[in-house]
Every structure is written in structure tokens, then in C-alpha cells.
């Protein structure tokens, strides 16, 4: 292809979020002709658009639903289309583009091509993946390994690729990547050195349609990983053990003691073992919840495969703190503790939180309800709470389902999180509850940009009402 032909080739990026912006900048730095298409339009996007244009990146704010006709002006000259993870991989427009043999790829796939020479850990799962990603990155950094963390948490992978390109004199030792199902399905060539599967429960079924499709996407990452690590405490993963590619299994359940396939496990006294070798006591981890012991074992298994000794791992774990919005302890006033678990965007994640903080609890929940089995959540609410305050789009629907299930605690519906927080404080004091827990079990997009914004709002509300000194 001549230089003139190359200059006429257009690389289209879909989406003006963090992933899309990073992908566009990466392509532009490589000298590509870049066009970003965004199907929304507001003041913030306009500001971002103007900034990118000043850097020589073309941006069009469509302000309409994505359609194949949006690509008509460039259909003969498009070289690649890079898709942000928020856009459904099975969108009809993307299917039609693939049908025209156009290179349609996820943002992670674009970045991965520039990073394949760096050893990597790819962490996926319905819940737990963010904690494992942060914990493992913390362990590696404290042991003087040059790492970067990104994907679905931290930096967009394209940003890491761009930084690595500019700082090629400081080669990374390891990439620690959290990879969502959305990112995996658009990046079929991503093949980590180590793959970790934390948990598997219903989530994102409004996009993946059914559990089997969701499972296949997650499994594909492990199939392409050189070393595989699984959580045997997860019932679904354990039930599929014989179908999954061979790997390392970890578990906290007592039956792990007698299982032949556990490599990392915890005994009745809380000591962590690697096969028959005692490593150290699990109490060195200073964050609550049995699920975090599962996360700990997964991180330890990966660190051992990378080559760290057990004493170095233990020393690093002692300084690991809870991650914002994931069972984040905010403090205690008059024997009432406050927890921010805004990351709980599905029922299973909220169940884990309800099991992990002091009972009885006043629960704050609501937002956009996802598909999934409601009843296990209700069962745990009955066991753990004195009352529940609901807010957001699905509040009334959740209330109806709770009433049908014969929940006897107090149920209050409020318009927003601020009103809900005030109500929760009053109920907690009236019922001598020990904890107020924000664990919404729903997506945040009805009232917030993301779960982080929702969690930050809750933390500010706690400060506003002078609950935490």
C-alpha cells in the first residue's frame, strides 16, 4: 500500500469514554488518520470533542442511536473500527460491518497488539475481580516489580500501551489486567500468561441473553491463558471443573482439606497452605468477608506462579487496604458502622456484603435492577437486616418483590440516595442496628455516571450529616 493510500485510510473509534479517548490518542500517536464517533451529545462531550480536535483527532457527535448508515461516508476508506466496551458487541451495526469484512475490534484488542511482549495476568469473573486485580498489583509492586494495572479498572489498556510506547526505556515486568466479559468478547486474541477466574453468577444477562453465552465468553479467556487459576468456592465453577481447561484451584471451604485438586487452601485455624506446606495465617489480610479470603488465595496463587516467595507475599498483604466502593469501611459513631459497597451492582455481590458486615443491618439498595435470581438476595436480607431503604428507578419494583416474599422488616422508598441515607440513620437508631450498608444490588446509571460517583456521593452524605467525625 502506498503512503498516499495509507493516508486516506481512516481508523474509526466508537465511544468517547476513557477507552475510546485512549484508543484514539494511541492511533493518532502512531500517525493514523483517526475519527471518533459518539452517539450522544452534551456539554461535557462537546468539551472533550474540542480538546481532541485540537490534537488533530476528528470527532463527530451523532446525537442519535448507532446505525450502519452512520458509517456510509467512510465505508470505502475505513481500515479499522475500534469499539468501546460499553457498546454491545452484537449490535446490528457492528454485525453488518463485520459482514463487510471490515476489521471491527474491541479497545482491549487494539492495545493488546502493542503489548503482547509483556507478561500479563488477566483477571475475570462476575464478582471479586477488581479486588484480586488491585491486591495482586499491590503485591507485585511492593516486591519491586515494574507493573501497570488496567483494563476494566485503573487505566484503559490503550493508555497503558501509549505510555509504554513513550517510555520504552522503562520496560514493564508485568501487566495486571481486569477484563470484563464485554472486553473479552471484543478481543479474541488476548492470551494472558496467567488467567484468573474469580466467580461466576448471573450478571449482564440483558446483554449476553443467557448464562451459557456469558460463561463461554469468560471461559474463552482461560482457554487462551498459559496458566489458569480458579476459585473452587464458587459452586458453578466447581460444577464445571471437568469441562474447564486444567489449572490451579484454590478454596476456603473446609472440604478443601480433603480435596485432591486444591493447591491453595485454608485450614480450620485460618492458616494458608500451598499443597501440604503451611505459608502464613490468613488474618494478615485486614479487610472483612470470607469472599476476600477467596480473593487472597487467588492473588497468592498468581504471585507464587510469578516467582515470589511466601514471606515476601505475606509482608505485602499486611499493607493492603480495602478498595473504594467495595465494602469500604467509613467509620463508627455511637456503635453504628457505615459501609460503602456501591460496587455491588448485582444481587450476588450484595449478598456477599450482607454476610460480611456486623448484623443487624439497615440496607440501602436500588438503581437499575438487572436480570437475575432475586430470591437468594431476599433470603439474606431476611437473615441480616432490620430494614431496607430503597431508592432509584427500580425501588418500587424491589419493594413489591420484598412484600411478596413476606419480608417483615421495615421497607421505605425514597426518591434519591440523600433522602434514603437520612431515613436509614433514623431506622438504625430506632432498631438498634449495628451497620448502615450501601450495597445497591443494581446498576447506577439512572441517577449517576457510574458506581464510583454513587459511592462518592454516599461518602459525602455521611460527612455532610456529621455522622463520621
Swiss-Prot record:
Q: Indicate the secretion signal residues.
A: none
Alphabetical GO CC annotations of the entry are: cytoplasm
Compartments where located: Cytoplasm
- Per the record, what are the reactions this protein catalyses? UDP-N-acetyl-alpha-D-muramoyl-L-alanine + D-glutamate + ATP = UDP-N-acetyl-alpha-D-muramoyl-L-alanyl-D-glutamate + ADP + phosphate + H(+)
Binding-site list for ATP: 125-131
What are the UniProt keywords, alphabetically? ATP-binding, Cell cycle, Cell division, Cell shape, Cell wall biogenesis/degradation, Cytoplasm, Ligase, Nucleotide-binding, Peptidoglycan synthesis
What Pfam family is a match, any one?
Answer: Mur_ligase_M
Q: What is the E.C. number?
A: 6.3.2.9
Q: Does the keyword Cytoplasm apply?
A: yes
What pathway does the UniProt record associate with this protein? Answer: Cell wall biogenesis; peptidoglycan biosynthesis
Q: Which family does it belong to?
A: Belongs to the MurCDEF family.
Reported function: Cell wall formation. Catalyzes the addition of glutamate to the nucleotide precursor UDP-N-acetylmuramoyl-L-alanine (UMA).
Which protein are we looking at?
UDP-N-acetylmuramoylalanine--D-glutamate ligase
Amino acid at each position: 500500500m502506498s503512503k498516499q493510500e495509507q493516508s486516506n485510510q481512516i481508523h474509526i473509534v466508537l465511544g468517547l469514554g476513557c477507552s475510546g479517548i485512549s484508543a484514539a490518542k494511541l492511533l493518532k500517536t502512531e500517525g493514523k488518520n483517526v475519527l471518533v464517533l459518539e452517539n450522544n451529545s452534551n456539554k461535557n462531550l462537546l468539551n472533550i470533542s474540542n480538546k481532541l480536535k485540537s490534537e488533530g483527532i476528528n470527532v463527530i457527535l451523532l446525537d442519535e442511536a448507532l446505525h450502519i448508515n452512520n458509517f456510509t461516508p467512510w465505508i470505502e476508506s475505513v481500515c479499522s473500527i475500534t469499539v468501546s466496551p460499553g457498546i454491545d458487541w452484537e449490535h446490528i451495526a457492528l454485525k453488518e460491518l463485520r459482514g463487510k469484512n471490515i476489521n471491527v475490534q474491541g479497545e482491549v484488542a487494539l492495545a493488546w497488539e502493542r503489548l503482547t511482549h509483556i507478561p500479563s495476568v488477566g483477571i475475570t469473573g462476575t464478582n471479586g475481580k477488581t479486588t484480586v486485580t488491585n491486591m495482586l498489583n499491590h503485591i507485585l509492586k511492593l516486591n519491586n516489580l515494574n507493573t501497570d494495572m488496567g483494563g476494566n479498572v485503573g487505566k484503559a489498556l490503550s493508555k497503558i500501551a501509549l505510555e509504554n510506547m513513550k517510555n520504552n526505556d522503562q520496560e514493564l515486568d508485568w501487566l495486571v489486567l481486569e477484563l470484563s466479559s464485554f472486553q473479552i468478547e471484543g478481543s479474541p486474541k488476548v492470551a494472558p500468561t496467567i488467567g484468573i477466574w474469580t466467580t461466576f453468577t448471573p450478571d449482564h444477562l440483558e446483554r449476553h441473553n443467557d448464562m451459557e453465552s456469558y460463561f463461554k465468553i469468560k471461559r474463552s479467556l482461560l482457554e487462551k491463558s498459559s496458566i489458569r487459576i480458579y476459585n473452587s468456592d464458587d459452586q458453578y465453577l466447581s460444577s464445571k471443573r471437568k469441562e474447564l481447561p486444567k489449572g490451579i484451584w484454590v478454596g476456603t471451604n473446609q472440604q478443601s482439606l480433603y480435596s485432591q485438586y486444591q493447591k491453595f487452601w485454608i485450614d480450620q485455624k485460618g492458616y494458608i497452605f500451598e499443597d501440604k506446606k503451611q505459608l502464613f495465617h490468613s488474618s494478615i489480610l485486614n479487610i472483612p468477608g470470607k469472599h476476600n479470603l477467596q480473593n487472597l488465595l487467588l492473588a497468592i496463587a498468581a504471585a507464587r506462579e510469578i516467582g515470589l516467595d511466601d514471606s515476601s507475599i505475606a509482608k505485602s498483604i499486611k499493607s493492603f487496604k480495602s478498595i473504594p466502593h467495595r465494602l469500604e469501611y467509613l467509620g463508627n459513631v455511637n456503635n453504628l458502622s457505615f459501609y460503602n459497597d456501591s460496587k455491588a451492582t448485582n444481587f450476588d455481590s450484595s449478598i456477599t456484603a450482607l454476610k460480611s458486615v456486623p448484623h443487624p443491618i439497615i440496607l440501602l439498595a436500588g438503581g437499575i435492577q438487572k436480570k437475575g435470581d432475586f430470591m437468594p438476595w431476599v433470603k439474606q436480607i431476611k437473615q441480616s437486616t432490620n430494614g431496607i431503604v430503597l431508592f432509584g428507578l427500580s425501588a418500587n419494583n424491589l419493594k413489591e418483590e420484598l412484600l411478596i416474599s413476606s419480608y417483615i422488616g421495615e421497607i421505605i422508598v425514597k426518591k434519591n440516595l440523600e433522602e434514603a441515607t437520612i431515613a436509614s440513620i433514623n431506622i438504625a437508631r430506632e432498631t438498634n442496628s449495628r451497620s448502615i450498608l450501601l450495597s445497591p444490588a443494581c446498576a447506577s446509571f439512572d441517577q449517576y455516571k457510574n458506581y464510583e460517583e454513587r459511592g462518592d456521593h454516599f461518602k459525602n452524605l455521611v460527612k455532610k450529616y456529621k455522622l463520621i467525625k
